[in-house]
């Protein structure tokens, strides 16, 4: 038998930042995190307050903003805390909780991007039937179903990880408890964990990405049948924001998991993890607000109504 130690805590390696630059990066990450919180909260509030945004697209967008807000909050507070103190430990239960919520909100973003792509497909290819196909009841049920799927999927992987045994090495080579890193630390058999990750990754990453590509292929095909400058402009104005977010989200995932790793794979994994846990959630509100007339008009209406009330 191997000598096994009951692990009560893990040590997060953190980001490879020189000591003299810690304060600078702490301030940078704090500003990025606060920007993420405020930007996504603004979208959620606007969608709730402005009746003209009570549409399927903005239902999905508000849930995406909530998911982004929580996704960043899973890792950033602990990272900021560790940068201000010498104690980088995280309790065993806290590590599993971080892994669970990281998967919940990461999966939810992937699902919501598919739902938003389908919404754009119906709006452009079947405009006369849009309200009947994308009914409020259907969209609400779809969002609830997606939350149930993501929480169940995350719970399955978390429970499988909880059954693993860990030996003396408890240093997590990342700034948060990533499931892949935890499996490398386990000294018990991880075959079931790896098998389920492979199966579920196919279902939750590859298939959603394929569905998004298919939706936009149908949109492009529909536009090409009746080519016009107005039609092309409509597609870009309607889908540009969503395509930008899809590119950011899946671009980082492809860069992290599909590109070959070099000698500095740990640093690369941390950088890519920062991209999709911090940078992408921060940029999403700017992408949707700067390229979306409805959001700009809604913001003006809400501000004007507040002035009238005051």
Swiss-Prot record:
Q: Does the keyword Glycoprotein apply?
A: yes
- The UniProt transmembrane annotation reads 24-48, 56-77, 99-118, 138-156, 195-217, 235-258, 271-290
The alphabetical list of record keywords is:
Cell membrane, Disulfide bond, G-protein coupled receptor, Glycoprotein, Membrane, Olfaction, Receptor, Sensory transduction, Transducer, Transmembrane, Transmembrane helix
Q: Give me the Extracellular side stretches, as residue ranges.
A: 1-23, 78-98, 157-194, 259-270
Could you name the domain of life of the organism this protein comes from? Eukaryota
Query: What Gene3D superfamilies does UniProt report for this protein, alphabetically?
Result: Rhodopsin 7-helix transmembrane proteins
List where in the cell it is found. Answer: Cell membrane
Annotated Pfam families: 7tm_4
- Any one GO cellular component localisation term in the record: plasma membrane
Its Gene Ontology molecular function terms? G protein-coupled receptor activity; olfactory receptor activity
GO biological process: one example: signal transduction
Q: By what name is this protein known?
A: Olfactory receptor 1496
Q: Which organism is it from?
A: Rattus norvegicus
Lineage here is: Eukaryota, Metazoa, Chordata, Craniata, Vertebrata
Q: Which gene encodes it?
A: Olr1496
């Amino acid at each position: 038998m191997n000598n096994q130690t009951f692990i009560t805590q893990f040590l997060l390696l953190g980001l490879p930042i020189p000591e003299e630059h810690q304060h600078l990066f702490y301030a940078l990450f704090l500003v990025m995190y606060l920007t993420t919180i405020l930007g996504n909260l603004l979208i959620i509030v606007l969608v709730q307050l402005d009746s003209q945004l009570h549409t399927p697209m903005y239902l999905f967008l508000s849930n995406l903003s909530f998911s982004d807000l929580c996704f960043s909050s899973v890792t950033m507070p602990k990272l900021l805390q560790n940068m201000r103190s010498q104690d980088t430990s995280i309790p065993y239960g806290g590590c599993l909780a971080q892994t669970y919520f990281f998967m919940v909100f990461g999966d939810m973003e992937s699902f919501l991007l598919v739902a938003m792509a389908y919404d754009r497909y119906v709006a452009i290819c079947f405009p006369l039937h849009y309200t009947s196909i994308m009914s409020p009841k259907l969209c609400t049920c779809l969002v609830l179903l997606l939350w149930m799927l993501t929480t169940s999927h995350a719970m399955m992987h978390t429970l499988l990880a909880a059954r693993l045994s860990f030996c003396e090495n408890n240093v997590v080579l990342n700034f948060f408890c990533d499931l892949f890193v935890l499996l490398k630390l386990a000294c018990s058999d991880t075959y079931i964990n790896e098998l389920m990750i492979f199966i579920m990754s196919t279902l939750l990453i590859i298939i959603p990405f394929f569905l998004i590509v298919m939706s936009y292929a149908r949109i492009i095909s529909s536009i090409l049948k009746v080519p016009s400058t107005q039609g092309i402009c409509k597609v870009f104005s309607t889908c540009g924001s969503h395509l930008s977010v899809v590119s950011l989200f899946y671009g980082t995932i492809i860069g992290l998991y599909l590109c070959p790793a070099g000698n500095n794979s740990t640093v690369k994994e941390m950088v890519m993890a920062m991209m999709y846990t911090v940078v992408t959630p921060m940029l999403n509100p700017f992408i949707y607000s700067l390229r979306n007339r409805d959001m700009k008009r809604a913001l003006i209406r809400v501000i004007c109504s507040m002035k009238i009330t005051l």
